[in-house]
Protein backbone atom coordinates (compact mmCIF):
# COMPACT_ATOMS: atom_id res chain seq x y z
CA UNK A 1 0.00 0.00 0.00
CA UNK A 2 1.02 3.60 -0.54
CA UNK A 3 1.62 6.01 2.31
CA UNK A 4 -1.68 7.67 1.38
CA UNK A 5 -3.62 4.42 1.49
CA UNK A 6 -2.06 3.48 4.83
CA UNK A 7 -3.03 6.88 6.24
CA UNK A 8 -6.59 6.52 5.00
CA UNK A 9 -6.83 3.19 6.82
CA UNK A 10 -5.51 4.83 9.98
CA UNK A 11 -2.24 2.90 9.89
CA UNK A 12 0.99 4.48 11.13
CA UNK A 13 4.02 3.59 9.02
CA UNK A 14 7.66 3.91 10.16
CA UNK A 15 8.03 6.75 7.66
CA UNK A 16 5.14 8.63 9.25
CA UNK A 17 6.59 8.15 12.72
CA UNK A 18 9.95 9.52 11.60
CA UNK A 19 8.45 12.56 9.86
CA UNK A 20 6.28 13.35 12.88
CA UNK A 21 9.36 13.18 15.10
CA UNK A 22 11.45 15.41 12.82
CA UNK A 23 8.67 17.97 12.49
CA UNK A 24 7.60 17.81 16.15
CA UNK A 25 4.08 17.29 14.83
CA UNK A 26 1.19 15.31 16.28
CA UNK A 27 1.08 11.99 14.42
CA UNK A 28 -2.69 12.15 13.92
CA UNK A 29 -2.39 15.58 12.29
CA UNK A 30 0.26 14.16 9.97
CA UNK A 31 -1.91 11.16 9.10
CA UNK A 32 -4.84 13.44 8.26
CA UNK A 33 -2.60 15.53 6.01
CA UNK A 34 -1.35 12.48 4.11
CA UNK A 35 -4.84 10.99 3.85
CA UNK A 36 -6.29 14.15 2.30
CA UNK A 37 -3.33 14.65 -0.04
CA UNK A 38 -1.99 17.82 1.53
CA UNK A 39 1.20 16.11 2.75
CA UNK A 40 3.39 13.63 0.87
CA UNK A 41 6.24 11.40 1.99
CA UNK A 42 8.17 10.41 -1.16
CA UNK A 43 9.38 6.90 -0.38
CA UNK A 44 9.61 4.22 -3.07
CA UNK A 45 8.99 0.71 -1.70
CA UNK A 46 12.16 -0.50 -3.47
CA UNK A 47 14.50 1.93 -1.70
CA UNK A 48 15.33 2.87 1.86
CA UNK A 49 15.79 6.57 2.49
CA UNK A 50 15.49 9.05 5.32
CA UNK A 51 11.78 9.98 5.28
CA UNK A 52 10.93 13.56 4.35
CA UNK A 53 7.49 15.09 4.70
CA UNK A 54 6.43 17.84 2.31
CA UNK A 55 3.29 19.90 2.69
CA UNK A 56 0.82 21.56 5.01
CA UNK A 57 2.02 22.54 8.51
CA UNK A 58 5.52 21.19 7.81
CA UNK A 59 8.82 23.01 7.48
CA UNK A 60 9.74 24.22 4.00
CA UNK A 61 11.87 21.66 2.17
CA UNK A 62 14.71 22.13 -0.33
CA UNK A 63 15.48 20.15 -3.48
CA UNK A 64 18.84 20.23 -5.28
CA UNK A 65 19.07 19.37 -8.97
CA UNK A 66 22.16 17.60 -10.24
CA UNK A 67 22.81 15.60 -13.40
CA UNK A 68 25.02 15.16 -16.42
CA UNK A 69 24.53 16.56 -19.90
CA UNK A 70 25.60 15.53 -23.38
CA UNK A 71 28.41 18.10 -23.09
CA UNK A 72 29.65 17.11 -19.63
CA UNK A 73 29.28 13.62 -18.20
CA UNK A 74 31.16 12.43 -15.12
CA UNK A 75 29.39 9.99 -12.81
CA UNK A 76 31.76 10.61 -9.91
CA UNK A 77 31.26 14.37 -10.20
CA UNK A 78 27.47 14.01 -10.11
CA UNK A 79 27.72 11.83 -7.01
CA UNK A 80 29.99 14.44 -5.42
CA UNK A 81 27.42 17.13 -6.19
CA UNK A 82 24.61 15.06 -4.72
CA UNK A 83 26.61 14.38 -1.56
CA UNK A 84 27.55 18.06 -1.24
CA UNK A 85 23.90 19.05 -1.60
CA UNK A 86 22.88 16.71 1.21
CA UNK A 87 25.81 17.78 3.40
CA UNK A 88 24.71 21.42 3.17
CA UNK A 89 21.09 20.66 3.94
CA UNK A 90 19.14 19.63 0.84
CA UNK A 91 16.13 17.52 1.79
CA UNK A 92 15.94 15.83 -1.61
CA UNK A 93 17.95 15.49 -4.80
CA UNK A 94 16.77 15.28 -8.40
CA UNK A 95 18.90 13.68 -11.09
CA UNK A 96 18.21 15.52 -14.35
CA UNK A 97 20.86 13.72 -16.41
CA UNK A 98 20.61 13.85 -20.20
CA UNK A 99 23.99 12.35 -21.09
CA UNK A 100 24.42 8.93 -22.71
CA UNK A 101 25.16 7.31 -19.33
CA UNK A 102 22.09 8.73 -17.61
CA UNK A 103 21.02 5.34 -16.24
CA UNK A 104 24.40 4.81 -14.61
CA UNK A 105 24.32 8.29 -13.08
CA UNK A 106 20.85 7.67 -11.66
CA UNK A 107 21.79 4.36 -10.07
CA UNK A 108 24.96 5.83 -8.58
CA UNK A 109 23.04 8.74 -7.06
CA UNK A 110 20.34 6.44 -5.68
CA UNK A 111 23.03 4.42 -3.92
CA UNK A 112 25.04 7.41 -2.70
CA UNK A 113 22.46 9.51 -0.84
CA UNK A 114 19.90 8.68 1.83
CA UNK A 115 17.40 11.43 0.97
CA UNK A 116 14.49 11.07 -1.48
CA UNK A 117 15.63 11.09 -5.11
CA UNK A 118 13.56 12.39 -7.99
CA UNK A 119 13.86 12.23 -11.78
CA UNK A 120 12.19 13.36 -14.99
CA UNK A 121 11.63 10.09 -16.91
CA UNK A 122 10.75 11.79 -20.20
CA UNK A 123 14.42 12.78 -20.43
CA UNK A 124 15.46 9.15 -20.66
CA UNK A 125 12.83 8.38 -23.30
CA UNK A 126 13.77 11.44 -25.35
CA UNK A 127 17.53 10.97 -25.05
CA UNK A 128 17.35 7.32 -26.09
CA UNK A 129 15.16 8.20 -29.07
CA UNK A 130 17.64 10.89 -30.08
CA UNK A 131 20.60 8.52 -29.79
CA UNK A 132 18.92 5.71 -31.74
CA UNK A 133 16.79 7.58 -34.27
CA UNK A 134 18.19 11.10 -34.34
CA UNK A 135 15.22 13.00 -32.89
CA UNK A 136 13.51 13.35 -29.53
CA UNK A 137 10.10 13.26 -31.24
CA UNK A 138 10.81 9.73 -32.46
CA UNK A 139 10.09 8.32 -29.01
CA UNK A 140 6.78 6.54 -28.74
CA UNK A 141 4.32 5.90 -25.95
CA UNK A 142 5.98 2.61 -25.02
CA UNK A 143 9.34 4.38 -24.68
CA UNK A 144 7.81 6.91 -22.28
CA UNK A 145 6.19 4.36 -20.01
CA UNK A 146 9.17 2.03 -20.18
CA UNK A 147 11.35 4.81 -18.77
CA UNK A 148 8.82 5.49 -16.02
CA UNK A 149 8.54 1.82 -15.06
CA UNK A 150 12.31 1.25 -15.13
CA UNK A 151 12.96 4.24 -12.90
CA UNK A 152 10.19 3.26 -10.50
CA UNK A 153 11.68 -0.23 -10.30
CA UNK A 154 15.12 1.29 -9.62
CA UNK A 155 13.73 3.01 -6.52
CA UNK A 156 13.12 6.60 -7.64
CA UNK A 157 11.00 8.26 -4.94
CA UNK A 158 9.33 11.05 -6.93
CA UNK A 159 9.01 11.80 -10.63
CA UNK A 160 8.21 14.92 -12.57
CA UNK A 161 5.60 14.02 -15.18
CA UNK A 162 4.35 16.70 -17.56
CA UNK A 163 0.82 15.33 -17.85
CA UNK A 164 -0.64 18.84 -18.05
CA UNK A 165 0.88 19.42 -21.49
CA UNK A 166 -2.02 18.62 -23.82
CA UNK A 167 -2.99 19.26 -27.42
CA UNK A 168 -5.20 22.10 -26.22
CA UNK A 169 -2.62 23.74 -23.95
CA UNK A 170 0.11 23.52 -26.62
CA UNK A 171 -2.17 25.23 -29.14
CA UNK A 172 -3.02 27.86 -26.54
CA UNK A 173 0.67 28.47 -25.85
CA UNK A 174 1.35 28.89 -29.58
CA UNK A 175 -1.37 31.55 -29.81
CA UNK A 176 -0.37 33.33 -26.63
CA UNK A 177 2.38 35.62 -27.90
CA UNK A 178 4.75 34.56 -25.14
CA UNK A 179 8.24 36.00 -25.33
CA UNK A 180 10.05 32.86 -24.13
CA UNK A 181 7.62 30.20 -25.27
CA UNK A 182 8.13 26.85 -23.52
CA UNK A 183 11.26 26.78 -21.33
CA UNK A 184 10.62 23.50 -19.52
CA UNK A 185 12.85 20.88 -21.13
CA UNK A 186 10.44 18.04 -20.39
CA UNK A 187 7.57 20.23 -21.47
CA UNK A 188 9.36 21.03 -24.72
CA UNK A 189 10.02 17.32 -25.39
CA UNK A 190 6.31 16.57 -25.09
CA UNK A 191 5.09 19.69 -26.89
CA UNK A 192 7.36 18.86 -29.83
CA UNK A 193 6.09 15.26 -29.80
CA UNK A 194 2.47 16.45 -29.76
CA UNK A 195 3.04 18.86 -32.67
CA UNK A 196 4.99 16.29 -34.69
CA UNK A 197 2.47 13.47 -34.22
CA UNK A 198 -0.72 15.52 -33.83
CA UNK A 199 -1.71 13.20 -31.02
CA UNK A 200 -2.58 13.70 -27.37
CA UNK A 201 0.17 13.54 -24.76
CA UNK A 202 0.31 9.87 -23.62
CA UNK A 203 1.06 11.00 -20.06
CA UNK A 204 -2.35 12.69 -20.13
CA UNK A 205 -4.39 10.31 -22.28
CA UNK A 206 -3.06 7.28 -20.39
CA UNK A 207 -2.86 8.93 -17.00
CA UNK A 208 -4.68 5.99 -15.40
CA UNK A 209 -1.86 3.66 -16.39
CA UNK A 210 0.67 6.15 -15.02
CA UNK A 211 -1.24 6.06 -11.73
CA UNK A 212 -1.08 2.26 -11.70
CA UNK A 213 2.72 2.33 -11.97
CA UNK A 214 3.02 5.03 -9.32
CA UNK A 215 0.71 3.09 -7.00
CA UNK A 216 2.66 -0.16 -7.41
CA UNK A 217 5.93 1.40 -6.22
CA UNK A 218 4.49 4.27 -4.15
CA UNK A 219 6.19 6.81 -6.38
CA UNK A 220 5.09 10.35 -5.60
CA UNK A 221 4.05 12.13 -8.79
CA UNK A 222 5.31 15.67 -9.18
CA UNK A 223 2.95 17.14 -11.75
CA UNK A 224 5.25 19.23 -13.89
CA UNK A 225 4.58 22.78 -15.00
CA UNK A 226 5.63 22.45 -18.61
CA UNK A 227 4.20 25.89 -19.37
CA UNK A 228 5.84 27.76 -16.53
CA UNK A 229 6.91 31.31 -17.42
CA UNK A 230 10.51 31.66 -18.58
CA UNK A 231 10.71 35.40 -18.02
CA UNK A 232 8.91 37.95 -15.88
CA UNK A 233 6.88 39.20 -18.84
CA UNK A 234 5.30 35.76 -19.35
CA UNK A 235 4.24 35.26 -15.72
CA UNK A 236 0.61 34.54 -14.81
CA UNK A 237 -0.43 34.28 -18.45
CA UNK A 238 -3.19 32.12 -19.93
CA UNK A 239 -0.98 29.09 -20.80
CA UNK A 240 0.43 28.94 -17.27
CA UNK A 241 -2.95 29.17 -15.57
CA UNK A 242 -4.72 26.84 -18.02
CA UNK A 243 -2.12 24.15 -17.38
CA UNK A 244 -2.56 24.64 -13.64
CA UNK A 245 -6.29 23.96 -13.99
CA UNK A 246 -5.49 20.72 -15.82
CA UNK A 247 -3.07 19.76 -13.06
CA UNK A 248 -5.80 20.39 -10.50
CA UNK A 249 -7.96 17.75 -12.20
CA UNK A 250 -5.01 15.34 -12.25
CA UNK A 251 -4.45 15.89 -8.53
CA UNK A 252 -8.00 14.77 -7.85
CA UNK A 253 -7.58 11.66 -10.00
CA UNK A 254 -4.31 10.76 -8.26
CA UNK A 255 -5.95 11.04 -4.86
CA UNK A 256 -8.81 8.82 -6.02
CA UNK A 257 -6.16 6.20 -6.89
CA UNK A 258 -4.38 6.51 -3.50
CA UNK A 259 -1.32 7.94 -5.27
CA UNK A 260 0.68 10.70 -3.60
CA UNK A 261 1.22 13.78 -5.72
CA UNK A 262 2.44 17.35 -5.60
CA UNK A 263 2.22 20.21 -8.09
CA UNK A 264 5.10 22.13 -9.64
CA UNK A 265 5.03 25.87 -10.17
CA UNK A 266 6.87 28.88 -11.57
CA UNK A 267 9.36 29.84 -12.62
CA UNK A 268 10.13 33.50 -13.40
CA UNK A 269 7.70 35.89 -11.72
CA UNK A 270 7.53 39.52 -10.55
CA UNK A 271 7.61 39.81 -6.78
CA UNK A 272 4.12 41.29 -6.59
CA UNK A 273 2.53 38.26 -8.31
CA UNK A 274 4.01 35.50 -6.16
CA UNK A 275 1.61 35.53 -3.21
CA UNK A 276 -1.45 35.48 -5.47
CA UNK A 277 -0.04 32.60 -7.52
CA UNK A 278 0.61 30.53 -4.40
CA UNK A 279 -2.93 31.12 -3.16
CA UNK A 280 -4.48 30.28 -6.55
CA UNK A 281 -2.59 26.97 -6.67
CA UNK A 282 -3.55 26.05 -3.13
CA UNK A 283 -7.19 26.82 -3.86
CA UNK A 284 -7.63 25.07 -7.21
CA UNK A 285 -5.44 22.08 -6.27
CA UNK A 286 -7.14 21.63 -2.88
CA UNK A 287 -4.01 22.19 -0.82
CA UNK A 288 -1.73 19.82 -2.73
CA UNK A 289 1.95 20.37 -1.85
CA UNK A 290 3.41 23.08 -4.08
CA UNK A 291 6.93 22.64 -5.48
CA UNK A 292 8.35 25.85 -6.98
CA UNK A 293 11.47 26.65 -8.98
CA UNK A 294 12.62 29.86 -7.35
CA UNK A 295 10.61 31.82 -8.32
CA UNK A 296 13.24 34.01 -9.96
CA UNK A 297 12.16 37.62 -9.43
CA UNK A 298 14.41 39.42 -11.92
CA UNK A 299 15.92 38.32 -15.22
CA UNK A 300 18.80 40.79 -14.84
CA UNK A 301 21.08 38.71 -12.62
CA UNK A 302 22.85 35.94 -14.57
CA UNK A 303 25.54 34.54 -12.31
CA UNK A 304 23.48 35.54 -9.28
CA UNK A 305 20.19 33.80 -10.02
CA UNK A 306 20.48 31.90 -6.73
CA UNK A 307 19.97 35.23 -4.95
CA UNK A 308 17.04 36.18 -7.17
CA UNK A 309 15.49 32.75 -6.55
CA UNK A 310 16.01 32.99 -2.79
CA UNK A 311 14.11 36.29 -2.70
CA UNK A 312 11.22 34.73 -4.61
CA UNK A 313 11.43 31.50 -2.66
CA UNK A 314 11.06 33.26 0.67
CA UNK A 315 7.92 35.07 -0.48
CA UNK A 316 6.55 31.87 -2.04
CA UNK A 317 7.15 29.77 1.07
CA UNK A 318 5.63 32.43 3.31
CA UNK A 319 2.48 32.25 1.17
CA UNK A 320 2.05 28.50 0.85
CA UNK A 321 4.85 26.93 -1.20
CA UNK A 322 6.05 23.75 0.49
CA UNK A 323 9.09 22.66 -1.53
CA UNK A 324 11.72 24.97 -3.03
CA UNK A 325 13.81 23.77 -5.95
CA UNK A 326 17.14 25.49 -5.59
CA UNK A 327 18.74 27.62 -8.27
CA UNK A 328 22.53 27.83 -8.57
CA UNK A 329 24.77 30.72 -9.70
CA UNK A 330 25.26 28.75 -12.94
CA UNK A 331 21.55 28.84 -13.85
CA UNK A 332 20.98 29.82 -17.51
CA UNK A 333 24.76 29.71 -18.10
CA UNK A 334 26.32 26.29 -17.55
CA UNK A 335 26.04 22.95 -15.82
CA UNK A 336 26.74 23.63 -12.12
CA UNK A 337 29.84 22.44 -10.29
CA UNK A 338 30.11 21.32 -6.68
CA UNK A 339 30.60 24.86 -5.34
CA UNK A 340 27.61 26.09 -7.36
CA UNK A 341 25.50 23.35 -5.79
CA UNK A 342 26.61 24.36 -2.30
CA UNK A 343 25.81 28.02 -2.91
CA UNK A 344 22.43 27.12 -4.39
CA UNK A 345 21.48 24.97 -1.41
CA UNK A 346 22.53 27.64 1.09
CA UNK A 347 20.58 30.34 -0.75
CA UNK A 348 17.44 28.19 -0.74
CA UNK A 349 17.91 27.30 2.92
CA UNK A 350 18.05 31.01 3.73
CA UNK A 351 14.75 31.47 1.88
CA UNK A 352 13.13 28.51 3.64
CA UNK A 353 14.37 29.60 7.06
CA UNK A 354 13.19 33.17 6.54
CA UNK A 355 9.72 31.96 5.60
CA UNK A 356 9.50 29.37 8.38
CA UNK A 357 10.62 31.93 10.97
CA UNK A 358 7.95 34.33 9.69
CA UNK A 359 5.42 31.48 10.01
CA UNK A 360 6.66 31.04 13.60
CA UNK A 361 7.34 27.33 13.10
CA UNK A 362 8.85 26.17 16.41
CA UNK A 363 12.06 24.69 14.96
CA UNK A 364 12.82 27.72 12.81
CA UNK A 365 11.99 30.28 15.49
CA UNK A 366 13.93 28.40 18.17
CA UNK A 367 17.05 28.38 16.00
CA UNK A 368 16.75 32.16 15.51
CA UNK A 369 16.64 32.59 19.29
CA UNK A 370 19.65 30.31 19.70
CA UNK A 371 21.69 32.35 17.23
CA UNK A 372 20.68 35.60 18.92
CA UNK A 373 21.78 34.22 22.28
CA UNK A 374 25.11 33.03 20.84
CA UNK A 375 25.80 36.48 19.38
CA UNK A 376 24.85 38.26 22.59
CA UNK A 377 27.19 35.93 24.50
CA UNK A 378 30.06 36.27 21.97
CA UNK A 379 29.93 32.49 21.58
CA UNK A 380 31.64 32.29 18.21
CA UNK A 381 31.86 28.50 18.13
CA UNK A 382 28.13 28.16 18.64
CA UNK A 383 27.44 30.76 15.96
CA UNK A 384 29.53 28.78 13.48
CA UNK A 385 27.82 25.54 14.49
CA UNK A 386 24.35 27.00 14.01
CA UNK A 387 25.16 28.66 10.68
CA UNK A 388 24.05 27.03 7.42
CA UNK A 389 27.70 27.21 6.33
CA UNK A 390 30.11 26.96 9.25
CA UNK A 391 33.25 27.29 7.11
CA UNK A 392 32.71 30.68 5.51
CA UNK A 393 32.00 32.70 8.69
CA UNK A 394 34.97 31.04 10.42
CA UNK A 395 37.24 32.01 7.52
CA UNK A 396 36.04 35.62 7.69
CA UNK A 397 36.74 35.77 11.40
CA UNK A 398 40.22 34.35 10.92
CA UNK A 399 41.12 36.87 8.20
CA UNK A 400 41.83 39.49 10.84
CA UNK A 401 42.44 37.78 14.21
CA UNK A 402 42.64 39.99 17.27
CA UNK A 403 43.82 39.26 20.78
CA UNK A 404 40.46 39.73 22.49
CA UNK A 405 38.48 36.56 21.74
CA UNK A 406 35.14 38.36 22.00
CA UNK A 407 35.84 41.13 19.51
CA UNK A 408 35.68 41.05 15.74
CA UNK A 409 37.65 43.26 13.39
CA UNK A 410 34.62 45.33 12.35
CA UNK A 411 34.05 47.19 15.63
CA UNK A 412 36.92 46.10 17.87
CA UNK A 413 36.80 47.96 21.19
CA UNK A 414 33.78 49.96 19.95
CA UNK A 415 31.49 46.91 19.95
CA UNK A 416 27.95 48.05 20.84
CA UNK A 417 27.18 44.92 22.84
CA UNK A 418 30.33 45.23 24.94
CA UNK A 419 29.94 48.95 25.57
CA UNK A 420 26.44 48.52 26.91
CA UNK A 421 27.38 45.43 28.91
CA UNK A 422 30.33 47.21 30.56
CA UNK A 423 28.19 50.26 31.32
CA UNK A 424 25.76 48.04 33.17
Curated annotation (Swiss-Prot):
Disulfide cross-links: none
GO process terms (BP): thiamine biosynthetic process; thiamine diphosphate biosynthetic process
Keywords: 4Fe-4S, Iron, Iron-sulfur, Lyase, Metal-binding, S-adenosyl-L-methionine, Thiamine biosynthesis, Zinc
Residue sites binding Zn(2+) per the record: 268, 332
Record pathway: Cofactor biosynthesis; thiamine diphosphate biosynthesis
Catalysis: reaction(s): 5-amino-1-(5-phospho-beta-D-ribosyl)imidazole + S-adenosyl-L-methionine = 4-amino-2-methyl-5-(phosphooxymethyl)pyrimidine + CO + 5'-deoxyadenosine + formate + L-methionine + 3 H(+)
EC numbers, comma separated: 4.1.99.17
Annotated binding of substrate, by residue: 65, 94, 123, 162, 184-186, 225-228, 264, 291
Transmembrane segments: none
Keyword 4Fe-4S in record: yes
PANTHER family membership: PHOSPHOMETHYLPYRIMIDINE SYNTHASE, CHLOROPLASTIC (PTHR30557:SF1), THIAMINE BIOSYNTHESIS PROTEIN THIC (PTHR30557)
NCBIfam families attached to this UniProt entry: PRK13352.1, thiC
Protein name: Phosphomethylpyrimidine synthase 2
Name of the encoding gene: thiC2
